[in-house]
């Protein structure tokens, strides 16, 4: 007797999805049903029968044919799916989706007949670049601002400041206020989630808290109470509060100020372990210039990556975006865990949902860029040789030998490969593209001119109906 084989038909769908129609012969279905019954029989306990010796009909009557079929059907789908993707050399990006649903399939399941299953899954998209050479981008030409050195020194002074109590004067910007407050929504009188504290140290700086909160405390004296009528910004992080009016009852419990150290050689020794203030300034300038140059380089790379992404011709499947979103959330959770936070209590379903929504646009951008770089690698045959990977891996030898954790060498090699390939691709982009630096003044001038032109057109559009009315009269 010739054993019947699984029949697979595939159809390409939009958004890099593929449909698979499977025809599973009745012999396979009967075999799985029989195997399921035997498996349950070996472990089922029914009074009056020895373990493993329960008659088939008794078992079916006791457990129910529907439950037996459901168990067998799950195994049939799983095995047939794995066999089908191997036969067709398909690399799925997502779990298979049963088009007709499991319940519908179970309702019509008959092991005496050929079983037809319709499945869909996401697959890697076909990549093509409309253009790779001769890309042109514009970036704003910026100069290093020497004022940033003074700002860095001032920041360091603030960090090393002594905190002293304020006596006989009202609060002012720059102070540290110890406040208690309670907030409610003006319309519903409902308490604001996270909008209260019995004691909180608040640096009185603009843009801290919601608009008007810090400004409302400025001028208060210790033991003063004040009612603040404020409004949450329309783009506030907490969705429930956006655009709502609120009432805060605030009490100033204590007031402190910072006593800043003098800028001298002693400060240089304390702040940066340098012998003199002059030496400290030089060191800060060097670091800031390096950071500035790196930032400018990254701006250029970002612009080139965006330009290349726009040239990508591909239907990106939803599964790819979902995977990127999930990876981002997992990385965030790992960072929180390293800080000692309880992940289980912190990462509630609501927070995970919020993070998924907020990180999705960036995830889409990341996937688009990565696919564009992959397409460039394929079209220009840009690769990384084994000797390059091995050379780079030597840099990690010392770190690997000292590490107390088990390091996955193969995974590290993959990371090194991806990093080296990305470096090569970006270098190729820089060499084969045009980057034009435009003055910040030109950008502002162009923006003003566009705004004026838009305002003029809007004004003309508004006056046009009035002109027509006069003509009719």
Curated annotation (Swiss-Prot):
<keyword id="KW-0131">Cell cycle</keyword>
<dbReference type="GO" id="GO:0051301">
    <property type="term" value="P:cell division"/>
</dbReference>
<dbReference type="GO" id="GO:0043022">
    <property type="term" value="F:ribosome binding"/>
</dbReference>
<dbReference type="InterPro" id="IPR027304">
    <property type="entry name" value="Trigger_fact/SurA_dom_sf"/>
</dbReference>
<dbReference type="InterPro" id="IPR001179">
    <property type="entry name" value="PPIase_FKBP_dom"/>
</dbReference>
<dbReference type="InterPro" id="IPR036611">
    <property type="entry name" value="Trigger_fac_ribosome-bd_sf"/>
</dbReference>
<feature type="domain" description="PPIase FKBP-type">
    <location>
        <begin position="174"/>
        <end position="261"/>
    </location>
</feature>
<dbReference type="Pfam" id="PF05697">
    <property type="entry name" value="Trigger_N"/>
</dbReference>
<protein>
    <recommendedName>
        <fullName>Trigger factor</fullName>
        <ecNumber>5.2.1.8</ecNumber>
    </recommendedName>
</protein>
<dbReference type="Pfam" id="PF00254">
    <property type="entry name" value="FKBP_C"/>
</dbReference>
<dbReference type="InterPro" id="IPR046357">
    <property type="entry name" value="PPIase_dom_sf"/>
</dbReference>
<dbReference type="GO" id="GO:0044183">
    <property type="term" value="F:protein folding chaperone"/>
</dbReference>
<feature type="compositionally biased region" description="Basic and acidic residues">
    <location>
        <begin position="456"/>
        <end position="466"/>
    </location>
</feature>
<keyword id="KW-0132">Cell division</keyword>
<dbReference type="InterPro" id="IPR037041">
    <property type="entry name" value="Trigger_fac_C_sf"/>
</dbReference>
<dbReference type="GO" id="GO:0005737">
    <property type="term" value="C:cytoplasm"/>
</dbReference>
<dbReference type="InterPro" id="IPR005215">
    <property type="entry name" value="Trig_fac"/>
</dbReference>
<dbReference type="GO" id="GO:0043335">
    <property type="term" value="P:protein unfolding"/>
</dbReference>
<keyword id="KW-0143">Chaperone</keyword>
<dbReference type="GO" id="GO:0051083">
    <property type="term" value="P:'de novo' cotranslational protein folding"/>
</dbReference>
<keyword id="KW-0963">Cytoplasm</keyword>
<dbReference type="GO" id="GO:0061077">
    <property type="term" value="P:chaperone-mediated protein folding"/>
</dbReference>
<feature type="region of interest" description="Disordered">
    <location>
        <begin position="437"/>
        <end position="473"/>
    </location>
</feature>
<dbReference type="GO" id="GO:0015031">
    <property type="term" value="P:protein transport"/>
</dbReference>
<keyword id="KW-0697">Rotamase</keyword>
<dbReference type="InterPro" id="IPR008880">
    <property type="entry name" value="Trigger_fac_C"/>
</dbReference>
<keyword id="KW-0413">Isomerase</keyword>
<dbReference type="InterPro" id="IPR008881">
    <property type="entry name" value="Trigger_fac_ribosome-bd_bac"/>
</dbReference>
<comment type="function">
    <text>Involved in protein export. Acts as a chaperone by maintaining the newly synthesized protein in an open conformation. Functions as a peptidyl-prolyl cis-trans isomerase.</text>
</comment>
<comment type="similarity">
    <text>Belongs to the FKBP-type PPIase family. Tig subfamily.</text>
</comment>
<dbReference type="Pfam" id="PF05698">
    <property type="entry name" value="Trigger_C"/>
</dbReference>
<dbReference type="GO" id="GO:0003755">
    <property type="term" value="F:peptidyl-prolyl cis-trans isomerase activity"/>
</dbReference>
